[in-house]
A protein has these predicted regions:
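N-terminal metal-binding scaffold of metallo-dependent hydrolase/deaminase domains
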Residues: 1-36, 369
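Conserved, mostly hydrophobic/aromatic
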Residues: 57, 126, 182, 212, ...
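Divalent metal-dependent hydrolysis catalytic cores, especially in the metallo-beta-lactamase
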Residues: 59, 74-103, 119-132, 159-171, ...
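Active-site mouth loops of central-metabolism enzymes
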Residues: 59-71, 138-145, 190-192
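Active-site gating loops and adjacent loop-to-helix segments of metal-dependent hydrolytic enzymes
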Residues: 79-89, 133-160, 203-215, 226-240, ...
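Active-site core of metal-dependent hydrolases
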Residues: 153, 157-279
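His/Asp/Glu-enriched, well-ordered alpha-helical/loop segment
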Residues: 232-241, 247, 259-271, 276-360
Length: 371
């Protein structure tokens, strides 16, 4: 494939009249006025070309949930690619060890035999079971346990190698030492669903934690005398901050605060999507609980927010609406999420990178996925 006349996001800026030669699913050449013997030549006529989005926190999409196993993850892979996503971390939630292992088995199966035309599964994000009962949010807290090696083995069932990230409450007994154990194994530890104070957040970072799960949601709040999780995260340069830019989970000013404090390299746009994402309002499920979606907001019967219906397309557009430049919004939805979980292959347009792109009009309306 030869892509012509793109306004491509390269090396942190948009470069017009860019051509890309694609061979065997990878970017083989980047330049201007490229020529090649190709059956498939796509002239973008100045449209914007982003690397495919990377979503490191997504539970479900278009009616299928990670917890339902392999076929659900395959469905997510296929459908997410249509929405401009190149790679993602299927995200588990609080459940029994048996159900958690089933979900991880499904993720592993898709990693071992990927969908031919789907977004790449980079690994699993485990959002449980080492969480704080007082900050459960929509997570069933009856399955929360202490972070011990025995519990880790019960909940992973031999699937540790495919776990890319885990959300933990660092104030739990034994958590700091276990953070060290996990990070030494190459797993990104994210602080979330937590009642930790600022000092505990910094201590967790000392032990290797470098990520915050859906910043400001399901954690201690920001206060001028007790800065809590978000206050510590804003000033700790070791920590990347996930945030849900749907205008529901966070006020736009809070999104602006995160972007201003963390910058485009440490502000990680996520969807935290549940199965209603890409679907109309109605009644859905999350972790066996009824979720009611009205005007795009997903809530349990008691009003608790239960994931989002956000897509990465809308996240990118909202970031610009909330004050980010197109370059900043592109970075926060592509390379920054990828790097936050140790991946430097996705989220960039460079020679050798996977050739999956999100095409937008010059006004940043989504057109199609290319690749």
């Amino acid at each position: 494939m030869l892509i012509k006349n793109a306004k491509a996001f390269l090396n942190g800026s948009f470069q017009e009249n860019t051509d890309l030669l694609i061979k065997d699913g990878k970017i083989a050449e980047i330049g201007t006025a490229l020529t090649a013997e190709c059956e498939n030549v796509v002239d973008l006529k100045g449209d914007v070309l982003l690397p495919g989005f990377v979503d490191v926190h997504i539970h479900a999409f278009m009616g299928k949930d990670t917890m339902n196993g392999e076929e659900a993850v395959r469905h997510m892979s296929r459908e997410l690619k249509k929405f401009g996503v190149a790679a993602f971390l299927p995200t588990t939630m609080s459940a029994s060890p048996e159900d958690t292992c089933k979900a991880l088995d499904g993720i592993r199966a898709v990693m071992e035999a990927p969908e031919a035309d789907g977004a790449t599964v980079l690994g699993a994000h485990m959002e449980a079971p080492f969480l704080n009962e007082g900050k459960a949010g929509a997570q069933p807290k009856q399955f929360f346990v202490l972070p011990t090696e025995e519990n880790w083995q019960r909940y992973t069932g031999g699937n540790e190698p495919i776990v890319r990230m885990i959300t933990m409450a660092p104030e739990k007994e034994g958590a700091l030492d276990f953070i060290t154990r996990l990070t030494n194994s190459g797993i990104t530890v994210s602080i979330g669903h937590t009642g930790a104070d600022a000092e505990t957040v910094h201590a967790a970072a000392d032990h290797g934690a470098n990520h915050i799960t859906h910043t400001f949601n399901a954690q201690t709040p920001l206060n001028h005398r007790s800065p809590g999780v978000p206050g510590a995260a804003m000033v700790d340069e070791r920590i990347a901050c996930e945030f849900i830019s749907d205008g529901i989970h966070l006020h736009p000013d809070i999104c602006r605060l995160i972007m201003r404090c963390k910058g485009k390299e440490l502000a990680v746009a996520i969807t935290d999507a549940m199965e209603a994402a890409g679907m109309p309002d109605g009644k859905y499920q999350l972790g066996g609980q009824d979720v009611f979606v009205k005007e795009g907001a997903a809530r349990l019967e008691d009003g608790t927010l239960a994931g989002s219906t956000l897509t990465m397309i809308r996240a990118f557009q909202n970031l610009m609406k909330f004050g980010a430049t197109p370059e900043e919004a592109a970075t926060m939805t592509t390379s920054t999420p990828a790097k936050s979980v140790g991946n430097h292959e996705y989220g960039v347009i460079k020679i050798g990178a996977p050739a999956v792109f999100a095409r937008f009009t010059p006004e940043y309306e989504f057109v199609e996925t290319i690749g």
